[in-house]
């Protein structure tokens, strides 16, 4: 994947955990705003090796780590849809669930018919069953680092998401914590962009300085 915008002479490749430092406050603010309001035809471009633009729905943006709700309706909708797809790929499990749902439905229908009121009912789908069971992410994060790791784990699970963007996360993480996150990102083959307003320790990073020159630091 690649990133491009007007101040760059050429696109920046996004591989694993990429750190991009924007030293000019106005530029940093503007790029964060572009990410927040991202559209396929916006000035900020994310695209793959085939020059295909990354869709808004394929990007996960985290501007407030502590305030990020891993059980928001948007996240849960994606998780439930992925679970449904998993069941569809396992015919034996899906068949077993369908039989159990049919049995439960028959019992409820019988009671509806016995009731004096003229009751209606609908068949329940696997997706509706997942929702009714209240399937959600169990959160156990006590620190900002643990919350970041939790977000990465959720992002890994969401197959329709292609890019995760952390904004100014380095301000809350130690060098060892950033290293641990980078290791996890590398091992799980994720694509993550860290947007930072200042240099992030001595990790490999791209730095767009206040004169708008792009510098690479600590690159192997």
Curated annotation (Swiss-Prot):
Function: CRISPR (clustered regularly interspaced short palindromic repeat), is an adaptive immune system that provides protection against mobile genetic elements (viruses, transposable elements and conjugative plasmids). CRISPR clusters contain sequences complementary to antecedent mobile elements and target invading nucleic acids. CRISPR clusters are transcribed and processed into CRISPR RNA (crRNA). Binds dsDNA, binding is disrupted by EGTA.
Protein name: CRISPR-associated protein Csn2
Lineage: Bacteria, Bacillati, Bacillota, Bacilli, Lactobacillales
Description of how the protein assembles with itself and partners: Homotetramer. Binds dsDNA.
Keywords: Antiviral defense, Calcium, DNA-binding, Metal-binding
Chain residues that bind Ca(2+) 1: 122-123, 128, 132
Classification via CDD domains: Csn2
Cofactor binding mode and count: Binds up to 2 Ca(2+) per subunit.
GO MF term list: DNA binding; metal ion binding
NCBIfam families registered for this protein in UniProt: cas_Csn2 (TIGR01866)
Annotated Ca(2+) 2 binding sites: 118, 138, 142, 150
Similarity annotation: Belongs to the CRISPR-associated Csn2 protein family.
Gene field: csn2
Cofactor dependency: Ca(2+)
Database matches in InterPro entries: CRISPR-assoc_prot_Csn2-typ, Csn2_sf
Biological processes, Gene Ontology terms: defense response to virus
Record Pfam families: Cas_Csn2 (PF09711)
């Amino acid at each position: 994947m690649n990133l491009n915008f007007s101040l760059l002479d050429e696109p920046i490749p996004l591989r694993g955990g990429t750190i991009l430092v924007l030293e000019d406050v106005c530029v940093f603010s503007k790029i964060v705003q572009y990410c927040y309001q991202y559209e396929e035809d916006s000035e900020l471009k994310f695209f793959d090796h085939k020059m295909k633009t990354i869709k808004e729905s394929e990007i996960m943006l985290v501007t407030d780590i502590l305030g990020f709700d891993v059980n928001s309706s948007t996240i849960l909708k994606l998780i439930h849809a992925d679970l449904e797809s998993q069941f569809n790929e396992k015919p034996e499990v899906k068949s077993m669930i369908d039989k159990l749902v049919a049995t439960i439905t028959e019992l409820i229908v019988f009671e509806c018919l016995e009731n004096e009121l003229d009751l209606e009912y609908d068949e329940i789908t696997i997706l509706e069953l997942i929702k009714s069971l209240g399937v959600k992410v169990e959160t156990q994060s006590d620190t900002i680092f643990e919350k970041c790791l939790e977000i990465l784990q959720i992002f890994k699970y969401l197959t329709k998401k292609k890019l995760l963007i952390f904004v100014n996360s380095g301000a809350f993480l130690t060098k060892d914590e950033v290293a641990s996150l980078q290791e996890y990102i590398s091992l799980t083959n994720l694509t993550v962009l860290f947007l930072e307003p200042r240099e992030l320790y001595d990790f490999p990073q791209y730095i767009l300085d206040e004169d708008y020159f792009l510098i690479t630091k600590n690159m192997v």
